[in-house]
C-alpha cells in the first residue's frame, strides 16, 4: 500500500517542502527511513512505534519503507515525525479521509504527545506560498503559526486527537488568527534615571534616529552601560514585516515561548566578552544564528569591548558592512540577516582612568597601547559616532532637576524616522545608516558652507572614504532631527566632533 503525506523541512532560515512517502508491502518485517535523514529522523522509528502502541494500534508486520523526498536534501530534526505517523496510518488504511492540502509538522513522543519544535514560523510561511490550506502543528507552537493568515492552523496535543479528527469522530477547530499586541516598552529603564551626560544622551539620540553604530568610551562608573541599556526605550517600534523577520530567527533558535509567539520589541542582545566567534557570528555543524543575527532589526551591545578576543571582534567587520552573515558548510551555505545597531562600551585603558581629569592612570604607556590595539582601525571606522562619556559631576548627581524622559527623546527619534521613511519610500532603505554609496550624494545634499567644512574636516583628519560616508550619514540624521532638508554647516560640525576619539586615544 502506497501513501504520501506533506511535511516541511528547514535549512537555516529557509523552509522547503518534504513529501513523506510510504510503501507497506509483504516481506521481512522492517522499518526503514531513506531520503538523507539525520540521526534524529532515523530515531523517529522508535518514537512512532511507541506512539502507535499508546494509541492501541499494532505496528504492521510487514516491510515498511519511508522515503523523505526530495532525496538529495538533508532532513534534520524531529519535524517530520507527525507526517510519518500519519503516513503509516494512511498506509494501514486506519484513516480514510484524504490528506490532500494538509501538512504536518511536529515531534511525536513515546506516549503519543506532540512536542514543540523550532522554526514553525518560516515553515508555515512557506506552506502558505505553496497553497497548502491546513497545517497541523504542536499545540505549543499554535500561536506562533497563527500569526500567518491565509492558512488554517490546527493545534494538536496528542496523536489520539489526530486519529479522531481524520476519522471524523471529533473534529479539531482551526486556531484564530493571532494579532500581536502593541509592544509595551519597559519603563523601568528610562533615560530620566541617568544624571548629567547631556552630550552622550544627545549622541545616542542621533544614533537611534539614524540607526547608527556608536562607541562609548570613558572611565568606570561614568554611566556607559547605563546609557546603552536604555537605548531600546527610545528606538522606534518594529513594523510587522520587521517583526516577522526577527521572529523567524528567534524561532529557529528555539527562543520563542507560547506566551511570546512573536517578537514585538526590537531585540537587545548583550553577550559576555568571553563569547566565541561562533557564538557571536553563528556557526556549528548545523549552523545556528549568532548574537549578531539574533539582534537583527535591533541592538547589539558589546560591553567591555576591549576585553573581547580580537579575532572574535574582527569577525564583525564584514557583517556590519553587508548586513548579513554567510556560513558555509559541506551541506550548503546559510545566510542570516543582521541589520543591527552596534553599541560598544569600553574603558580607555586596563585601569580605566587614562585621560581622567582627577584620577591618575597607573597603566604603563605600552599597556594602554596594547589595550586599545584590540580595537583595530577598520573596526573603529565602522562606528559612526565616537562618544566620550565624562565622569559625572557631583552637581549633576545631587541636582533636584528632573532629567528628560525616554518618552520625550523617543518622540524626536520617531519624528526623524518619519522623515526618513518618506524620503526612502520605494528604495528598500529604512534609515540613514543604510544609505548605499550610490545614493549618498543624492540623499545627503549639502549647502556650500557645509561642503567647504566637510572638505576641511576630510583633509585635516585624514579620513578614510568609509569615515567620510559615515560623517555624511550622521550629518543627514542631525539635519533630520533639526527639520532641515539640506545638510548645513552646523550639522557637519556636530557630526565631525563624534570622530575625535580615534585621534585622542588611538593616534596620539
Model-predicted segments: where are they?
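Short beta-strand elements
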Residues: 18-24, 280, 384-387
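Conserved catalytic network of the ASCE P-loop NTPase/AAA+ motor domain
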Residues: 25, 56-59, 94-97, 129, ...
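Walker B catalytic acidic pair
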Residues: 297, 303-304, 315
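Basic, amphipathic alpha-helical bundle interface domains used for macromolecular binding and assembly
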Residues: 40-45, 60, 67-77, 287, ...
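Peripheral, non-AAA+ core regions of ATP-driven protein-machinery
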Residues: 1-215, 222-225, 263, 328, ...
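Conserved inter-motif catalytic segment of the P-loop NTP-binding fold
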Residues: 242-276, 283-284, 390, 430-439, ...
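Conserved alpha-helical scaffold flanking the Walker A/P-loop in AAA+ ATPase domains
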Residues: 205, 262, 267, 277-300, ...
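Walker A/P-loop
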Residues: 216-257
Amino acid at each position: 500500500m502506497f501513501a504520501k503525506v506533506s511535511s516541511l523541512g528547514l535549512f537555516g532560515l529557509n523552509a522547503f517542502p518534504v513529501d513523506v512517502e510510504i510503501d507497506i508491502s509483504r516481506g521481512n518485517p522492517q522499518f526503514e527511513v531513506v531520503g538523507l535523514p539525520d540521526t534524529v529522523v532515523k530515531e523517529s522509528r522508535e518514537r512512532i512505534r511507541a506512539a502507535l502502541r499508546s494509541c492501541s494500534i499494532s505496528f504492521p508486520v510487514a516491510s515498511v519503507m519511508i522515503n523523505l523526498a526530495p532525496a538529495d536534501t538533508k532532513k534534520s530534526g524531529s519535524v517530520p515525525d507527525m507526517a510519518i505517523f500519519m503516513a503509516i496510518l494512511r498506509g494501514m488504511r486506519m484513516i480514510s479521509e484524504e490528506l490532500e492540502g494538509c501538512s504536518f509538522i511536529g515531534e511525536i513522543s513515546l506516549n503519543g504527545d506532540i512536542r514543540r519544535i523550532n522554526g514553525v514560523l518560516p515553515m508555515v510561511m512557506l506552506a502558505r506560498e505553496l497553497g497548502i490550506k491546513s497545517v497541523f502543528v504542536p499545540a505549543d507552537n499554535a500561536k506562533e503559526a497563527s500569526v500567518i493568515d491565509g492558512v488554517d492552523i490546527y493545534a494538536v496535543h496528542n496523536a489520539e486527537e489526530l486519529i479522531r479528527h481524520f476519522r471524523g469522530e471529533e473534529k479539531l477547530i482551526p486556531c484564530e488568527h493571532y494579532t500581536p499586541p502593541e509592544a509595551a516598552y519597559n519603563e523601568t529603564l528610562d533615560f530620566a534615571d541617568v544624571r548629567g551626560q547631556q552630550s552622550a544622551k544627545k549622541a545616542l539620540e542621533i544614533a537611534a534616529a539614524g540607526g547608527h553604530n556608536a562607541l562609548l568610551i570613558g572611565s568606570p562608573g561614568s554611566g556607559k552601560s547605563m546609557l546603552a541599556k536604555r537605548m531600546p526605550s527610545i528606538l522606534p517600534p518594529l513594523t510587522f514585516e520587521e517583526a516577522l523577520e526577527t521572529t523567524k530567527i528567534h524561532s529557529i533558535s528555539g527562543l520563542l515561548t507560547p506566551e511570546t509567539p512573536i517578537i514585538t520589541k526590537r531585540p537587545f542582545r548583550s553577550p559576555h566578552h568571553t563569547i566565541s566567534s561562533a557564538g557571536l557570528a553563528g556557526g556549528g555543524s548545523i549552523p545556528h544564528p549568532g548574537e549578531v543575527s539574533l539582534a537583527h532589526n535591533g541592538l547589539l551591545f558589546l560591553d567591555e569591548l576591549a576585553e573581547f578576543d580580537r579575532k572574535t571582534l574582527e569577525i564583525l567587520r564584514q557583517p556590519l558592512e553587508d548586513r548579513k552573515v554567510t556560513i558555509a558548510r559541506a551541506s550548503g551555505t546559510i545566510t542570516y540577516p543582521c541589520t543591527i545597531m552596534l553599541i560598544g562600551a569600553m574603558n580607555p585603558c586596563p585601569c580605566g582612568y587614562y585621560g581622567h581629569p582627577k584620577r591618575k592612570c597607573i597603566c604603563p604607556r605600552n599597556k594602554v597601547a596594547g589595550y586599545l590595539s584590540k580595537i583595530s582601525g577598520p573596526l573603529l571606522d565602522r562606528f559612526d559616532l565616537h562618544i566620550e562619556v565624562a565622569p559625572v559631576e557631583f552637581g549633576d548627581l545631587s541636582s533636584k532637576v528632573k532629567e528628560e524622559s525616554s518618552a520625550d527623546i523617543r518622540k524626536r527619534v520617531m519624528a526623524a524616522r518619519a522623515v526618513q521613511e518618506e524620503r526612502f519610500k520605494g528604495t528598500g532603505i529604512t534609515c540613514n545608516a543604510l544609505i548605499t554609496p550610490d545614493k549618498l550624494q543624492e540623499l545627503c545634499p549639502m549647502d556650500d558652507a557645509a561642503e567647504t567644512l566637510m572638505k576641511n574636516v576630510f583633509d585635516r583628519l585624514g579620513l578614510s572614504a568609509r569615515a567620510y560616508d559615515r560623517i555624511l550619514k550622521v550629518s543627514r540624521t542631525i539635519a533630520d532631527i533639526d527639520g532641515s532638508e539640506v545638510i548645513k554647516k552646523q550639522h557637519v560640525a556636530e557630526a565631525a566632533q563624534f570622530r575625535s576619539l580615534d585621534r585622542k586615544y588611538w593616534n596620539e
